[in-house]
Amino acid sequence: MGSEMCIRDRIKAKHGAAFSNKYTIADDSGLVIPELNYEPGIYSARYAGDAASDLDNRKKVIKKIENISKQSLDAYYVCVLVGLRANDDPMPIISEGKIHGRVSINSIGDGGFGYDKIFYPRGFNLSMAQIDSETKNKISHRAIASKNFLLQFK
């Protein structure tokens, strides 16, 4: 899944660098559920359709979990960052971050967005939407990818 995101990010970063003539960083993130053929993956934002809301997307995941008579499934969030110094940069910075956990048919919490209400990270008895923002900003897939990116950037 990360390789598809990397390819998409590299294209986005190349367009950004060509347009701005400045250092460009592209991000692609998503929820991956291996038992559901690695869905929603790169289609996470529009899983239930182009005009789908976060609620629509969560409902589609929940329905698929229920269709296979499960309460939850292993899953992970993944974020890929690609940084280019110029449109033709031969050595882009590429960074990936993942957080593993489970997606559940139980949608709980007021915080976050996307699939956070049904994603329960490993080591927590809370959904991502229930975890305080300070903690979430330390453990999330985006935080991990950002830290890895900055280490390479130096």
Residue ranges of predicted features:
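Anionic-ligand binding patches
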Residues: 4, 8-154
